[in-house]
Every structure is written in C-alpha cells, then in structure tokens.
Curated annotation (Swiss-Prot):
One family name in Pfam for this protein: DUF1444
Name this protein carries in UniProt: UPF0354 protein BCE_4835
Top-rank taxon, per record: Bacteria
InterPro entries the record matches: DUF1444
Family of the protein in this entry: Belongs to the UPF0354 family.
TM stretches of this protein: none
Length: 270
C-alpha cells in the first residue's frame, strides 16, 4: 500500500477521534490540526513528515504520533483545569435557569431579586457551570458551592468613598468580573457594618460594582435609589435596580420611588 498525506490524515483522525476534540485539515500545507473544542488549544501535525517515518517504521510511526498528540492534548486540558477557579457570580432572578433545554445551571437562591450562579474561571474567560460541566469536572453541587464561597472570600477589596448630605457611599469597582460577588463575603459585610452608624444599605446594580451605603436620613435613601437605577441602566450585565437593607445577615429589598421630597412640619415661616 502506498501511504499518502490524505490516507495518513484519515488514519490519525480515526485513532484520535474524541467528542471533545476537533480536526482541521489544510490540504495545501498538508497539515492536520487536532484541538480541544472548548479552549481551541491544539497540536499541528505535518503529514509528509509522518508519511516519511511510516516508510521506515510502518505502523509504529502512526502509533507514536497518535500517542504524542493524545498525551499533549490531555496535558493541556489538565493544565487548564488546574489553573481554573470556581467562583460565584450574582445574577438577576430573571436570568435563564438552563444553558439549554434539559441542562440546568447550578444555582443557589440569594435574595428576592438575586440568584447565585457558579463560574469556572480560567483567567481569560469563564463559563457558568451547568449539570453537564459539573459531571465533566467530577464534582458535586455541594463541593462547587463550598469551593466558590472559599474563593470569593479570597477576592481583595478596596472601596472608594463619597459623602453626600451626611450619607456615606462606598464603591467597589475593580472590573475583575466579580465586584458584585463580594456581596457574598460575610466578613466584608460585617466589617462594614461595624463602621456604619446609620442603616447599612447594599446594592449590586450590575456585575462590575458593589455599593455599600451608610444612610442616616431620607435624602440618603433617595440618592441610593437614583444611583442604583443609573448603574443598573448602564451595566454590561445588569442585576437589579433595587437596593437592600442589610441587617443580621439578611437582605431586605427597599421599594422606594426616587424623588426629591420636602419634609414639612406644618408650620409657616415668615
């Protein structure tokens, strides 16, 4: 049998066939690329070189190349999984519950307005964990939740501060994709609670901001309502336009129509 690049391509594709790998063939350059579907990382195999080895070693040449490609791709996949972190992300309760029909996301209830999803983060991008990915990772839902909350507590935070009409507003906006996630860090919330003299109000209008406010008067409630609405409208991944009073570990949504109010005591001046 005369071996050609095309025949070698077919032989390698047969031996390296896996549901998680893709093949691309450049007939001009006689190169076969085998890559991971999810990360697009892969190996290029120059077929004329393999054919030349086959002329000398026959079957052994094909086995060696197939083994090399397989081991390299498996090593790449392990490296990615080791580098990946699982982190929680906050989403609106209106966010889809399934990746596709019959494949629900892993979720946890949070507040009346928000829900917790879980992301597999590989630094450059992240993917929300659904049941199929959960099985692929070989983890249970409980393990995912525990790992995610542990990693959330390791996220750093540094607030910017602004005071208006006696009310103090603290803003966290690192743009790491997990600013709203910091709302799940109980020790962070407790440390803020200790420094706040009025009502502690918390808002996550979109993914890339966490607002904590020390509200001491009615004007402060108007400001936080307007502020949250503005951030919600501008956010790349909006979550909720409502803010929450935080007390004893619970979040109570505030239903306020933001408007300028004038308090009167019924007395005329003049």
């Amino acid at each position: 049998m005369k071996m050609t690049s095309k025949k070698m391509k077919d032989e390698l594709m047969k031996r390296l066939s896996r549901p998680e790998w893709d093949f691309q063939y450049d007939s001009e350059k006689e190169v076969l690329r085998i890559e991971q579907k999810d990360s697009k990382k892969g190996i290029n195999v120059s077929l004329p070189g393999v054919v030349a080895k086959w002329e000398v070693n026959k079957e052994k040449a094909i086995e060696e190349v197939a083994y090399y490609v397989q081991e390299a791709l498996i090593a790449m996949h392990k490296e990615e999984n080791n580098a990946a972190k699982i982190l929680p992300v906050i989403r609106s309760t209106s966010f889809p519950k399934q990746a596709e029909e019959g494949n629900p996301f892993i979720m946890t209830d949070h507040t009346a307005e928000t829900r917790i999803y879980y992301a597999l983060d590989s630094n450059k991008t992240y993917r929300l964990i659904d049941e199929r990915l959960l099985q692929k990772l070989g983890l249970t839902e409980q393990q995912v939740r525990e790992m995610a909350l542990f990693n959330a507590r390791s996220l750093g935070y540094e607030f910017k501060q602004d005071t208006v009409a006696g009310n103090t507003f603290y803003f966290l906006n690192t743009n790491d994709g997990y600013d709203a996630t910091r709302i799940l860090n109980e020790s962070l919330l407790q440390s803020m609670r200790e420094k706040i003299s009025g009502d502690m109000v918390v808002a996550v209008p979109h993914q890339d901001v966490l607002i904590i406010a020390d509200i001491v008067n009615e004007i402060g409630y108007d400001i936080i309502a307007q502020m949250t609405m503005k951030f919600f409208a501008e956010g790349h991944v909006p979550i909720t336009s409502l803010s929450f009073v935080y007390e004893d570990g619970d979040f109570e949504p505030i239903f306020i129509l933001a408007k300028n109010r004038k308090k009167t005591d019924g007395k005329e001046k003049g």
